[in-house]
Amino acid sequence: MSYKCSRCKRDVTLDEYGGVRCPYCGHRVLLKERGGDVKEVNVE
C-alpha cells in the first residue's frame, strides 16, 4: 500500500520500512494515496 509523507511529500510503502514513520524525515503522519480508478455510474 502506498502512502505519502505529510512533511516531505515523498512516497512511502509501509511493507519495506516496517513501521508508521517516514524513513526519509522521521515524520509520523502519513497520508493514504487514492487510487487512479475512475468509476462510471449510470443515472437514469
From Swiss-Prot:
Record GO terms (molecular function): DNA binding; DNA-directed RNA polymerase activity; zinc ion binding
A Pfam family reported for this protein in Swiss-Prot or TrEMBL: Zn_ribbon_RPAB4
Catalytic activity: RNA(n) + a ribonucleoside 5'-triphosphate = RNA(n+1) + diphosphate
SMART domains listed in its UniProt record: RPOLCX
Note on cofactor: Binds 1 zinc ion.
EC number: 2.7.7.6
Top-level taxon: Archaea
Family the entry assigns: Belongs to the archaeal Rpo12/eukaryotic RPC10 RNA polymerase subunit family.
HAMAP family in the record: RNApol_arch_Rpo12
Protein name listed in UniProt: DNA-directed RNA polymerase subunit Rpo12
Organism: Halorubrum lacusprofundi (strain ATCC 49239 / DSM 5036 / JCM 8891 / ACAM 34)
